[in-house]
Amino acid sequence: MARSLKKNPFVANHSLRKIQNLNIKEEKKIIVTWSRASVIVPAMIGHTIAVHNGREHLPIYVTDRMVDHKLGEFAPTLLFQGHARNDKKSRR
């Protein structure tokens, strides 16, 4: 279910403040964040945001097609190792 239009999209205050300061200074720095639930807003376009996936921060360059998606969508948390080749114990 989508978020109500009466409410604004959720963006962590510390991340938004950092992005606004960088936009004023016209600088490009990597912004480190743990807030995977934050929604990408148009002010973030062109910045690189390092999103935590539980183990490390993955750098994500924000483009215009990413607007209205969450930061966590672009930082996968699970690494699929593949199915076991010869697992005869589980068949019994």
Swiss-Prot record:
GO cellular component: chloroplast; mitochondrial small ribosomal subunit
Gene3D superfamilies noted in UniProt: 30s Ribosomal Protein S19, Chain A
Entry-linked InterPro entries: Ribosomal_uS19, Ribosomal_uS19_bac-type, Ribosomal_uS19_CS, Ribosomal_uS19_SF
Keywords for the protein's UniProt record, in alphabetical order: Chloroplast, Plastid, Ribonucleoprotein, Ribosomal protein, RNA-binding, rRNA-binding
Subcellular location: Plastid, Chloroplast
GO BP term, example: ribosomal small subunit assembly
Single GO molecular function: rRNA binding
Role this protein plays: Protein S19 forms a complex with S13 that binds strongly to the 16S ribosomal RNA.
Family per record: Belongs to the universal ribosomal protein uS19 family.
HAMAP family: Ribosomal_uS19
This protein's name: Small ribosomal subunit protein uS19c
Annotated source species: Picea abies (Norway spruce)
